[in-house]
Amino acid sequence: SLLEFGRMIKEETGKNPLSSYISYGCYCGWGGQGEPKDDTDRCCFVHDCCYGKLWGCSPKTDIYFYFRKNGAIVCGRGTWCEKQICECDKAAAICFRENLATYKEEYHSYGKSGCTEKSPKC
């Protein structure tokens, strides 16, 4: 669910997921269109694509379990959907951490009106 995803983001980046990622660029937050603005926004685009492959699952509300082993996120027990949602969220949280150096404040609270280019394919 969004709660676990938020906790993962906080653990991986040290950033508050709501204030830092909820409306970043063209793809972070609800919906998405246009060309991702940078690598962090591309993390969100890939995350949206990952969720899009999970037919019959409810990524925003399905609760899943994860733990850490030697600092790494490990998706734990649960249904197929729960495990797949966890893997999508894990990949995005790691992507955010790997792109912290290029995170741009100018893309925080970015208006979707600036996202008019053709959207890339997943």
Swiss-Prot record:
Q: What is its EC number?
A: 3.1.1.4
Q: Name the cofactor(s) required for activity, per the record.
A: Ca(2+)
Active site: which residues?
47, 89
Give one Pfam hit by family name.
Phospholip_A2_1
Provide the disulphide bond pattern: 26-115, 28-44, 43-95, 49-122, 50-88, 57-81, 75-86
Q: Would the keyword Oxidoreductase turn up in this protein's UniProt record? A: no
Q: Which family does it belong to?
A: Belongs to the phospholipase A2 family. Group II subfamily. D49 sub-subfamily.
| The protein's name in its UniProt record | Basic phospholipase A2 Ts-G6D49
